[in-house]
Amino acid sequence: MQQARVRLAGVDPDDLDNICGEVQEIADKTGVKVSGPVPLPTKTLEVPSRKSPDGEGTATWEHWEMRVHKRLIDIDADERALRQLMRIQVPNDVNIEIVLED
């Protein structure tokens, strides 16, 4: 049987956990086997910028940071389960990728 690998990525870990819970509920309702969610390493993007717009004065810096959290879920590729997966309401800041594997 084919497996669907669901990759979730977003900046808010609470949103990711909510979607992971919905995927597990769908798997329980349809009776398919699910493994995960597996938390993947968090990527940290840092951008340093000068506070002074003209370059004069002391060299003071601001550091901006964005953390990208990722989760991985493997689910059996049942037609009903995949149809319900496509209907999940996903927030705009969460990226979902579904890949079918043998």
From Swiss-Prot:
Q: Where is this region: Disordered?
A: 34-58
Q: Does the keyword Ion transport belong to this entry?
A: no
Cellular component terms, GO, for this chain's entry? cytosolic small ribosomal subunit
Q: Looking at the keywords, is Ribosomal protein present?
A: yes
Give the record's GO biological process terms: translation
| Single GO MF descriptor | structural constituent of ribosome
| Lineage top rank: taxon | Archaea
Q: Sorted alphabetically, which NCBIfam families does this protein's record hold?
A: uS10_euk_arch
For this chain, the family text in UniProt reads:
Belongs to the universal ribosomal protein uS10 family.
Q: What is this protein called?
A: Small ribosomal subunit protein uS10
The encoding gene = rps10
